[in-house]
């Protein structure tokens, strides 16, 4: 809403002295409001002072000041003279929000009648309801609740602040931190406040209460929150739990009450690897340390005895020794070196600090050790039986967890899937431990983008996609699953640049529905283009495009044909990848060139036996589109063509514009180009494999398509893995493509 200023100066020239007088009157108006001088306010308004004037520093108007003073009469006077009831201060606060801070129900009613929104907020996300909780204004809080205020609204802050994990607090957290016991009771008992709502840093109201510098009501507030089911294992800044914060407050009563909670994790550590017991020893808190020891705190969490000795606390030393603390505590070796370079620093830190073991697993749910977010928690660094692993967290018993573990257990022998090391359960969560890789495919392509050099092969794309194809092939044939979520974030690259398939929480045990396999193949087709394009087209954009549009975006014939075959796999969809691993896309340029030479070396081609099977197969069909090699003799370097035709000069049997003669030409040139007498010819052509790839970009695919299901495929390079999994369905052992593949 625009500011409504009913006291604008009359149009026309004004003297500088007049302007100065007007500005002075504006400042005097604010001063008069602050001094609660109603008569002077009236006089200045009638004299032309700007009722919506905002002072420079905070953007306060006369109305804001009147609301702050709870002067309802001055507020009404200003409104009658055109004060804007929704004008914001520089921090975004409106008169309505300030009325909640002042605790004036009458002013809150007034501004609601003037168009205020009960849930409007300032630029930092504070609503009137939150401010009433912050300042302990019970009547205002109850009034706003009745008028529809959102009790559990989380503070929405600026985007840059949100990236720093600031904001997200609720009115309950504010009341807990400020020590307003009555407000807290009302919020919990009458208004249904969520006791375990968390701010953007993951802190609940219990953490906020323990962060308060005022300890007078902290015990009462803590008891109240615990009685309403507050989570005692939540973490605040630097990973501190309520128990650790209570120890830092040196508050024996709080520690006692927290230890009475059924699910308290007594050995949890903060981000520095310190437990509540270690902190109690460092802070020389004998009674708290003794209480923790009696409640079962691990004494294997640091050099407790030496710390107590350095503090000259002999009685604490005796307590610690009586509970099993070691005199000769040996921390992890300082010279330990991680295998992972990307995660090395965090792994060294995790290796160094104390963490209570969960079965065979050591890990820490903390931002410092987080690899990625997931729908059920996240993926973290960890050690499983001292092996570096990625730990994927699930809610125990969730369908996603069951699918992930079931699929991983069936794939233990497959090298192109992440290795499954084991899992552990704890506090209603399942922790699944798999191969720790360096980065996702998406992150890897960010590094490789722009590396393409003209006239050079893309070995990276070929190798990565070969690994991905083998992984999906293993998943389909050996494991009997379909993935259902193939995307760049689920392809991981290890320290040796090998690709591994991961994230099986959407995978399905294949029961014969070809559509499930086709879904994987279509995603693979998009992954092919994504990798070839080095991620320059986002996978989300590729998913939004039709299959035909994706095919047309292909940069070369091999890529185009491979994607087309993935989109149209034919009847035997489950066998498709077995054959596509032998597709020309995966051949080196030298292999493509060698294949053309080998086919051209067939005797029926060399002798132009026109009725032969191979020349019949290579003959273009009547409905086929034109090819780059239709008039191939005109596209070869003129000098080279003359030189090669010279051999047939006596018989007049020159090369003709047929596929067979082109293959014979490639064979003959390959046999002789390295001879000394053909040195000049090689200078003109350069590398023959590159020359023919560029001159006839569709030739290899043409030959492959014509000969793939014939005996002449013997000339194709053998790229299949010797341990290729066998299909347990029909046709899997033949090694031949299905009609559609």
UniProtKB/Swiss-Prot annotation:
Residues 1-21, 715-741 are annotated as: Disordered. Changing residue 541 to E: No change in enzymatic activity. Residues 589-723 form the KEN domain. Residues 365-586 form the Protein kinase domain. The modification N6-acetyllysine is found at residue 684. After binding to 2-5A (5'-phosphorylated 2',5'-linked oligoadenylates) the homodimerization and subsequent activation occurs. Inhibited by RNASEL inhibitor ABCE1/RLI, a cytoplasmic member of the ATP-binding cassette (ABC) transporter family. Keywords: Acetylation, ANK repeat, Antiviral defense, ATP-binding, Cytoplasm, Endonuclease, Hydrolase, Metal-binding, Mitochondrion, Nuclease, Nucleotide-binding, Repeat, RNA-binding, Zinc, Zinc-finger. It is found in: Cytoplasm; Mitochondrion. Its cofactor is Mn(2+); Mg(2+). Residues 9-18 have a biased composition (Polar residues). GO terms for biological process: defense response to virus; fat cell differentiation; mRNA processing; negative regulation of viral genome replication; positive regulation of D-glucose import; positive regulation of transcription by RNA polymerase II; protein phosphorylation; regulation of mRNA stability. Changing residue 632 to A: No change in enzymatic activity. Its main location: cytoplasm. Residues 229-242 are annotated as: 2-5A binding (P-loop) 1. Belongs to the protein kinase superfamily. It is linked to Prostate cancer, hereditary, 1: A condition associated with familial predisposition to cancer of the prostate. Most prostate cancers are adenocarcinomas that develop in the acini of the prostatic ducts. Other rare histopathologic types of prostate cancer that occur in approximately 5% of patients include small cell carcinoma, mucinous carcinoma, prostatic ductal carcinoma, transitional cell carcinoma, squamous cell carcinoma, basal cell carcinoma, adenoid cystic carcinoma (basaloid), signet-ring cell carcinoma and neuroendocrine carcinoma. Endoribonuclease that functions in the interferon (IFN) antiviral response. In INF treated and virus infected cells, RNASEL probably mediates its antiviral effects through a combination of direct cleavage of single-stranded viral RNAs, inhibition of protein synthesis through the degradation of rRNA, induction of apoptosis, and induction of other antiviral genes. RNASEL mediated apoptosis is the result of a JNK-dependent stress-response pathway leading to cytochrome c release from mitochondria and caspase-dependent apoptosis. This is 2-5A-dependent ribonuclease. The gene is RNASEL.
